[in-house]
Amino acid sequence: MAVVKCKPTSPGRRHVVKVVNPELHKGKPFAPLVEKNSKSGGRNNNGRITTRHIGGGHKQAYRIVDFKRNKDGIPATVERLEYDPNRSANIALVLYKDGERRYILAPKGLKAGDQIQSGVDAAIKAGNTLPMRNIPVGSTVHNVEMKPGKGGQLARSAGTYVQIVARDGAYVTLRLRSGEMRKVEADCRATLGEVGNAEHMLRVLGKAGAARWRGIRPTVRGTAMNPVDHPHGGGEGRNFGKHPVTPWGVQTKGKKTRSNKRTDKFIVRRRSK
């Protein structure tokens, strides 16, 4: 995998930095594991904008990724690595010994021809999935479940991982990349290793059009708006003379937004960011 800085042959190419991976499959995805992915434009079922700055972009097909990794005791061979437009990580097409194919998140170091397995008897190596009570303390894992059988929810983006720092009875303590320390049931599954494609963070789109291809619309500053559109709007010059707020008047610098008191008891230490 190489990080390539483009030559400034035009203003749109001058700042582009690409991540090139020659190991990725260049053909179409595996059709039985692909389904339609309609765009919402950031609107809900009432047609109202619920997420700003979303719209347009290239048509994308959704790849059905196996986050549960619940096919126990059956070894699988990695057929190929693929690009997935729906996530920052790459995915791997694996063929199980019984003939079934599935997509999984591609961990760091995984390549075509490698063997992987799920279940309590799986070996301790990158790409294998086990309950966390069977994974040694100190290991780095990804695609971590928060409820047994629900499927991985933590550490699924490119280059991310979670570290198992302690095991105490029915729970294990995890250290997340944000610095948060959290308890999760020991029967929850996790995949060993860290997610691949860590160089994703080094890419630079280089121009506004590249963001539009990805369905990202412009973000207008509140201070550039009129008073009717934003609390920061209006006035002479650039100073808005108040604490920064969202378009709806909610504090936007440092205000805590967590409101799920039911699961507060599982958070040992809040995130440090």
From Swiss-Prot:
The keyword Transport does not apply. Keywords: Ribonucleoprotein, Ribosomal protein, RNA-binding, rRNA-binding. It comes from the Bacteria. It holds the Pfam family Ribosomal_L2. InterPro entries: NA-bd_OB-fold, Rib_uL2_dom2, Ribosomal_uL2, Ribosomal_uL2_bac/org-type, Ribosomal_uL2_C, Ribosomal_uL2_CS, Ribosomal_uL2_dom3, Ribosomal_uL2_RNA-bd_dom. Residues 39-48 have a biased composition (Low complexity). GO terms for biological process: cytoplasmic translation. GO terms for molecular function: rRNA binding; structural constituent of ribosome; transferase activity. Part of the 50S ribosomal subunit. Forms a bridge to the 30S subunit in the 70S ribosome. NCBIfam families: rplB_bact. Belongs to the universal ribosomal protein uL2 family. One of the primary rRNA binding proteins. Required for association of the 30S and 50S subunits to form the 70S ribosome, for tRNA binding and peptide bond formation. It has been suggested to have peptidyltransferase activity; this is somewhat controversial. Makes several contacts with the 16S rRNA in the 70S ribosome. This is Large ribosomal subunit protein uL2. It comes from Enterobacter sp. (strain 638). The lineage of its organism: Bacteria, Pseudomonadati, Pseudomonadota, Gammaproteobacteria, Enterobacterales. The gene is rplB.
